[in-house]
Every structure is written in C-alpha cells, then in structure tokens.
Amino acid sequence: MATHSPCIVIGDDEQGYDLDLFCIPKHYADDLEKVYIPHGLIMDRTERLAREIMKGMGGHHIVALCVLKGGYKFFADLLDYIKALNRNSDKSIPMTVDFIRLKSYCNDQSTGDIKVIGGDDLSTLTGKNVLIVEDIIDTGKTMKTLLSLLKQYNPKMVKVASLLVKRTPRSVGYRPDFVGFEVPDKFVVGYALDYNEYFRDLNHICVISETGKQKYKA
C-alpha cells in the first residue's frame, strides 16, 4: 500500500485570522471572510515539503510538471527550496521543468469535465521520473484524469505534490504523495488559487466571502 507524507490538518472549526492583522490588497477588502493560511506558514511548510521530496526522489533526474495556472506560485517556491537544498546538500536532484494547463472549475464548483488546454508534448515524459505540482486537490477527479493521461506515455515514476487537499464528501478518495495542508470543504483563494481568475495576486490563502463570489461570478 502506498505511503503518504504527513501534513498540517486544519480543523473544521478553524476560525482563521482577522483580515486587519495582515496586508490585504484594498480591492479585495470586502471580498474575503478571513485569512486562512498566512503566507509565512505556506513558505515554511513548502520548505519542509522540499526536503521530503528530496528524500523520496533524490538521486533521480526529475521532470517537475507544474499544473497551471493555480500551481505556479507553489511550484516556483517549492523549486526554489529544492534548488537551495541541491546547493547545500550531499544529495542533489538534477531537475528540469515542464508545464500543463487543466481546467475543471466554473465559479466555485469543480465541473468534473477535465480539459487539457495547454502544455508541451507529453511524450517527452516517457521513461522519466515525474513530479506533478498542483495547488489543490478537491474531488481528486482532475488529478486521477491527469495521471491516467500520463500513464499512456509510460513515465518511469510519478509522484504528486499538492499544497492543499480538501476534505469533501465529493472526494473520490485520491491522496497525493506530498501534501502541505489538509483543509475543510471551503472555497479558498490566494497564493495563485483563483476564483474565475481573480485573487491570484493575494499572498495569503483566504476564504472568499459571498460578496466576493457574487462580484466575480462568471
């Protein structure tokens, strides 16, 4: 049975933090309920994930595959930490990067209809050790679809790192290999997670308000 690394579990009763305690862009002042995961905590957790990935995949040339658009901030910061470990450790990982773009959301619901709307030729992943970097696992359908797609190209190994995993009754039971935080079934934005393309410019992970949902509804 596959083993998965531990993560920080945020309980259903977590209240988050008052917006006034952090620097929030004024144009989002009425669109958020609270700060859920402060930026500093995201960075500290990402640093530790980099170490776990090095331990689990070290010694192999890795193709790091970023799932756009939401994964780009986590991807960039995670790779920065891996590069720092490469510079300062006896065990280093040769790494190249690639990108794929998927779409499965309209407003705050995962549609279940997964579209690959970007990315290079996936045949380049044949025989490679692949690290998929994702922002959030919601139902798990998107990732299971992507993994099935990649399997057609016969990669040597595939591991998945996701910053967030959502606890939801809609889950198909999929669990990534590396997880930053497990969060309740709330729609979160910020740190490149979007709501119809908005809120990507927010440093912290926050819970969107009903006002925000209505304002930016597709």
Swiss-Prot record:
Gene Ontology molecular function: any one: magnesium ion binding
Main location: cytoplasm
Active site location: D138 (proton acceptor)
Positions bound to GMP: 69, 134-142, 166, 186-188, 194
Residue pairs linked by disulfide bridges in the UniProt entry: none
Enzyme Commission code(s) on record: 2.4.2.8
GO BP: any one term: IMP metabolic process
Top-level taxon of the source organism: Eukaryota
Enzyme class: transferase
Cofactor note: Binds 2 magnesium ions per subunit. The magnesium ions are essentially bound to the substrate and have few direct interactions with the protein.
Keyword annotations of the record: Cytoplasm, Glycosyltransferase, Magnesium, Metal-binding, Nucleotide-binding, Purine salvage, Transferase
Binding site for Mg(2+): D194
Signal peptide: none
Catalytic activity: IMP + diphosphate = hypoxanthine + 5-phospho-alpha-D-ribose 1-diphosphate; GMP + diphosphate = guanine + 5-phospho-alpha-D-ribose 1-diphosphate
SUPFAM superfamilies: PRTase-like
Compartmental location: Cytoplasm
Gene Ontology cellular-component terms listed: chromosome; cytoplasm
InterPro entries from the UniProt entry: HGPRT (IPR050408), Hxn_phspho_trans (IPR005904), PRibTrfase_dom (IPR000836), PRTase-like (IPR029057)
Pathway per the UniProt entry: Purine metabolism; IMP biosynthesis via salvage pathway; IMP from hypoxanthine: step 1/1
Necessary cofactors: Mg(2+)
Pfam families reported in the protein's UniProt record: Pribosyltran (PF00156)
Quaternary state and interactors: Homotetramer.
Known role: Converts guanine to guanosine monophosphate, and hypoxanthine to inosine monophosphate. Transfers the 5-phosphoribosyl group from 5-phosphoribosylpyrophosphate onto the purine. Plays a central role in the generation of purine nucleotides through the purine salvage pathway.
Similarity remark: Belongs to the purine/pyrimidine phosphoribosyltransferase family.
Name recorded for this polypeptide: Hypoxanthine-guanine phosphoribosyltransferase
Organism this protein belongs to: Gallus gallus (Chicken)
